[in-house]
A protein has these predicted regions:
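Thiotemplate assembly-line natural product biosynthesis machinery
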Residues: 1-18, 70-74
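Functionally critical, cavity-lining and gating residues within the transmembrane helices
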Residues: 2, 35, 48
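Amphipathic alpha-helical interaction surfaces in cytosolic regulatory modules
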Residues: 31-39, 59-61
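C-terminal structural segments of small proteins and small subunits
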Residues: 49-74
Length: 74
């Protein structure tokens, strides 16, 4: 699951490379529209539904992975 999240982030934000330190703070393309696209990709890829309060705390790779794990994604 962790590698798939990295792959999604890399493709979605059009990055040449990506690592586990990626966050909204260090990714220029991770803006509000990028966040909406990210949510759609994650929901589709992992067959989950994200609540608005969950979406608001997804500001880094680590936050995304922790949230997915809390939803039982492996």
């Amino acid at each position: 699951m962790e590698q798939k999240v990295l792959d999604i982030l890399k493709a979605l934000f059009e990055l040449e490379t990506v690592d586990t330190s990626i966050s909204q703070e260090n990714c220029e393309n991770w803006d509000s529209m990028g966040q909406l696209n990210l949510v759609a990709e994650l929901e589709m890829e992992f067959d989950i539904s994200l609540e608005p309060e969950e979406i608001g705390v997804m500001i880094s790779y680590k936050d995304i992975v922790n949230l997915l794990k809390s939803k039982g994604v492996k």
